[in-house]
Amino acid sequence: MIRQFVSHRGIPCYRLAVRRVELTEPFHHPSPWPLGRKNWSTSDEAKSKRAAMRKGGAPPPEHEDWELTVGIEIHAQLDTDAKLFSSASAALDDVPNSNIALFDIALPGSQPLFQPSTLIPAIRAAIALNCDVQRVSRFDRKHYFYQDQPAGYQITQYYEPYAKNGSIWLGAHDGIAKEDGEGVQIGIKQIQMEQDTAKSQELPSSTYLLDFNRVSRPLIEIITLPQIHSATTAAACVRKIQAILQSVGAVTTGMEMGGLRADVNVSVRKRSEAAGDHQYDGVAGLGQRTEIKNLSSFKAVEYAIIAERDRQIAVLKAGGTIQGETRGWTLGSTETRKLRGKEGEVDYRYMPDPDLGPVIIGDDVISDLRRNIPGLPDELLQMLVQDPKYGLSTVDAKTLIELDDGQRLEYYQDAVEILTTLQPDLSADFSAGKVVGNWVLHELGGLLTKSSAHWDSQRVPAQSLAEIINLLSRKNITSSSAKSLLAMAFDGDKRSISQIVEDKNLLFQSLSRHEYLALAEEVMRQNPKMVSEIREKAQLGKMGWLVGQIKRIGDPNRVEAQKAEEILRELILK
């Protein structure tokens, strides 16, 4: 039975008394964390296919009589310091083969030792995905031989997983296909815990290096029901599940950092004909499915499904039959490729693990975790859009939620809090949330993109960003000075914002009307044709260019664009 004992990053943790457990594994190797490689074809046909993929997953007119059905299996690394079945550290960035126990490398006589703390993020994931957490679950062995699995089997939960019967709702804001309307609900068959494999690195001359630090690192596998009928919606489903897992602290990283990958099961059938002969996970009337493994980005999920959909339809139109098999897809490819024939369940030789007892989870544990579950993405989205404190657009709110494993959102909220305390006297019309959102996403985001840097909340601390925005909103500095301050802080200037402003003499000193008139008249004298076009042809859009010229010949830290334009309008349009 699990009992509460300490807190895990602020959330209660529990101790489990294990009596007995079981496991199972696969007989092929789906190499869970592959290195993507490009496989570009330069033929006109391939270029045309890639262009069609980029337009989205909607089927072309000639495919409208065909129904696509997709089920997804998502493998995610749990956010835990412990391995699943050994006392070794789960850290991945240490020296290769430095975090291993005897069981991790399957030394004879070693046995698995279940680590109860790994259950906490797993249960949080199940609750967030609306699953029924099972009071009793068991581990099984899934047998296969591959170099990165020294035991010859993987420990998983095939027969009695710890969570079942979940669901996820995808709305239009999640980026689903237009044909799915305002929203679609996807069922989740089960979530099971399983151990990761070693990390392999291929070298020339058929040489492989193996790092066993990753062996027995805890994973969860989330299996959806085959209820998705669009490649676009399938990608949106993976994206939404990743966001949910990150929001509750269940996983380490997302697809972009290699902490999550997906396999997809794809089948097609002709709508005008009788229902298909196949049934998967209780969903009947489907066509023969194929499985595409090891997809490591949202676009890979979408493009691989499109490629396999088109391949299957072409085969069936030509009078052929679809073989149940495992296929692969590589970055840049327009076609899937056969990896192997699909093995039957018997080939994995699933069997209960005799070295592990059942996992028994008490109702009090589930209730406590449910009570303390952090905000889910849809709840966060609603708050960021509807709360006057933030007032973001749906697009900006979704972007903040999805960026950098939630770290950008936390940074944004910190900056809003700080800015609000700095501005108790400002007008109610000033929206701290909107202004900070623009700076975090666009100004700071632009610097990150330009430098190809990864997100680091300490590169420009939230306090510094709030101080810059505060100075700008009070018109103590100009917009160009604010951007310069941000760039200096981003590039490593460790001085306080106030010190930089003082050292660089950036405090705004407004120009007099006489100074504005002199600058405007000089710019008009240098650009008579532009002035004539504005005056005679009412080409007011060119006024901004003249404002830029005033900034160029004047002091950019003293010129206010609005006042400069007012003077120009007065002189040109009088």
Curated annotation (Swiss-Prot):
<keyword id="KW-0547">Nucleotide-binding</keyword>
<protein>
    <recommendedName>
        <fullName>Glutamyl-tRNA(Gln) amidotransferase subunit B, mitochondrial</fullName>
        <ecNumber>6.3.5.-</ecNumber>
    </recommendedName>
</protein>
<dbReference type="InterPro" id="IPR017959">
    <property type="entry name" value="Asn/Gln-tRNA_amidoTrfase_suB/E"/>
</dbReference>
<dbReference type="Pfam" id="PF02637">
    <property type="entry name" value="GatB_Yqey"/>
</dbReference>
<dbReference type="GO" id="GO:0030956">
    <property type="term" value="C:glutamyl-tRNA(Gln) amidotransferase complex"/>
</dbReference>
<keyword id="KW-0648">Protein biosynthesis</keyword>
<dbReference type="InterPro" id="IPR003789">
    <property type="entry name" value="Asn/Gln_tRNA_amidoTrase-B-like"/>
</dbReference>
<dbReference type="GO" id="GO:0070681">
    <property type="term" value="P:glutaminyl-tRNAGln biosynthesis via transamidation"/>
</dbReference>
<comment type="similarity">
    <text>Belongs to the GatB/GatE family. GatB subfamily.</text>
</comment>
<dbReference type="GO" id="GO:0050567">
    <property type="term" value="F:glutaminyl-tRNA synthase (glutamine-hydrolyzing) activity"/>
</dbReference>
<dbReference type="InterPro" id="IPR018027">
    <property type="entry name" value="Asn/Gln_amidotransferase"/>
</dbReference>
<dbReference type="Pfam" id="PF02934">
    <property type="entry name" value="GatB_N"/>
</dbReference>
<dbReference type="GO" id="GO:0005524">
    <property type="term" value="F:ATP binding"/>
</dbReference>
<keyword id="KW-0436">Ligase</keyword>
<feature type="region of interest" description="Disordered">
    <location>
        <begin position="34"/>
        <end position="62"/>
    </location>
</feature>
<dbReference type="GO" id="GO:0005739">
    <property type="term" value="C:mitochondrion"/>
</dbReference>
<feature type="transit peptide" description="Mitochondrion">
    <location>
        <begin position="1"/>
        <end position="12"/>
    </location>
</feature>
<dbReference type="InterPro" id="IPR014746">
    <property type="entry name" value="Gln_synth/guanido_kin_cat_dom"/>
</dbReference>
<dbReference type="GO" id="GO:0032543">
    <property type="term" value="P:mitochondrial translation"/>
</dbReference>
<dbReference type="InterPro" id="IPR006075">
    <property type="entry name" value="Asn/Gln-tRNA_Trfase_suB/E_cat"/>
</dbReference>
<keyword id="KW-0809">Transit peptide</keyword>
<comment type="subunit">
    <text>Subunit of the heterotrimeric GatCAB amidotransferase (AdT) complex, composed of A, B and C subunits.</text>
</comment>
<dbReference type="InterPro" id="IPR004413">
    <property type="entry name" value="GatB"/>
</dbReference>
<keyword id="KW-0496">Mitochondrion</keyword>
<keyword id="KW-0067">ATP-binding</keyword>
<comment type="function">
    <text>Allows the formation of correctly charged Gln-tRNA(Gln) through the transamidation of misacylated Glu-tRNA(Gln) in the mitochondria. The reaction takes place in the presence of glutamine and ATP through an activated gamma-phospho-Glu-tRNA(Gln).</text>
</comment>
<dbReference type="InterPro" id="IPR017958">
    <property type="entry name" value="Gln-tRNA_amidoTrfase_suB_CS"/>
</dbReference>
